Amino acid sequence: MDTTYEVKIWKIGSRKQAKGTTYTVRWVLGGREWRTPFATRALADAFRSELVSATRRGEAFSVLTGRPLSHTSGASSVSWYEFALRFTDAQWHRTSGNSRKTTSKVLMTATSALLRTSVPSTLDPVALRTALREFAFNTRRRAEAPPEVAAALKWVERNCHSMAVWEDSSRVEEVLQAVSSRLDGSETAASTIKRNRRVLNVMLEYAVKENVLRTNPLPKGRGTAPKTSIAVDKRSLINARQAAALLGWVRRRPRGGLRLHAFFATMYYAGPRPEEVVAMYVMDVRLPSAKAADQWGELLIHTAQPEVGKHWTNDGAIHEERGLKGRARDDMRTVPCRPALTRVLREHIEREGLKPGDLLFPGEKGEMLAGSVIRRAWRSARQETLTPEEFASPLGKRVYDLRNTCLTNWLNDGVPPAQVAEWAGNSVPVLLAVYARCIVGHLSDLKKRIEAGGDLPEI
């Protein structure tokens, strides 16, 4: 393509006509004058600003079209907001509910950073962000937006930059800063930053695929993303005394305490993820006869039901049925059920009068057990049984820490990592990366093994 860097941009000219005033942007390219008329000064200003920005970036102009080369990619003819909606719809049916929520939050933040003007006083910034997150970037709900939300989104549509803004490195940095920060300006967690940047990267790769951008403008290479660690914080692990106190308090809880005690005991003794436990049915529990000498049983883990919210699932349910994490859709795993857990589950099933086709841990009305109920009970148990210092610490802060404690106990009890990985639904490398720091009690034996190799002979 023939290009030139000889560009001169004139001021905007206006001309009154019978049908209204026309605002024209004029610029000279290699001795040839180009003109583009607009119906409003704002549109003319926006277009002229793009031309000026291109010259400041040192961008070449096409002598055939008169436009910067970035315009030939289609970036200037597509608004950011329009493209973000298109990307949302393209991703909706290929992603999970939680991924949809994350994508919506990232696009909301990016859109706020890519507005051409400040939010007017007539619009509430909080309501505007809610409109973007809950309606604009939600394929199912967009058409259901109430009038006030639709009006706010119309304002966003009119006041967003074009996709050409992604060809300005300073604006790209502004967006990256926005998705790396909380509303108060403080930096968010490294894992959140990494996840948000991953969404942006997928979106920009899609823009390249759709010929909206020529290249992905996100910086590449070492140091561009924060370092993250997947290792378990040893301070979050629960010892046997603390676990007994926590589960004992839950068992004595008047409302649903016995059911929740069995739920937490399953996590502590068998290590499934919370979303796997809520998805279990009575038929997934294989218990020996009460009179059998061997009281070991088995748990069949084959489904997960993460709680994502009714607005983000295909059928409007709060939970979304999925296969096991990192496994094929129809895969499953078998986990041993130690005698202590066998006793708890047998009593639970008999007390609740559960049938094989019933959920193992149903809610009060037979529905799937709500995450809010689980988290509220666990928080109350921590508050009532731990010291103020322990309660303020990471000790058992999340329900998930029961799983981490179980897997750590298995490793410390000498169960081979490959077997623990199979029971936990992890790969061995991931298991060791997450839990290796928590393996203790083997140092004395390891020292003896090293010494058994012998020292160098005296010469």
Segments from the language model and where they lie:
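Short, surface-exposed polybasic/aromatic micro-patch for ligand or macromolecular engagement
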Residues: 6-73, 328
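Conserved tyrosine-mediated DNA breakage-rejoining catalytic core shared by Y-recombinases
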Residues: 12-15, 123-133, 220-227, 242, ...
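Short, Lys/Arg-enriched alpha-helical recognition elements, typified by the DNA-recognition helix
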Residues: 26, 68-206, 220-222, 379
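DNA major-groove recognition helix of helix-turn-helix
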Residues: 48, 197, 281, 424, ...
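Basic, Lys/Arg- and aromatic-enriched nucleic-acid-binding interface segment
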Residues: 184-199, 213-280, 292-296, 320, ...
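C-terminal flanking helix
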Residues: 201-204, 208, 428, 439, ...
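Short, basic (Lys/Arg/His-rich) helix/loop patches that form interaction surfaces
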Residues: 250-260, 270, 335, 343, ...
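DNA/chromatin major-groove-contacting recognition/catalytic segments
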Residues: 433-459
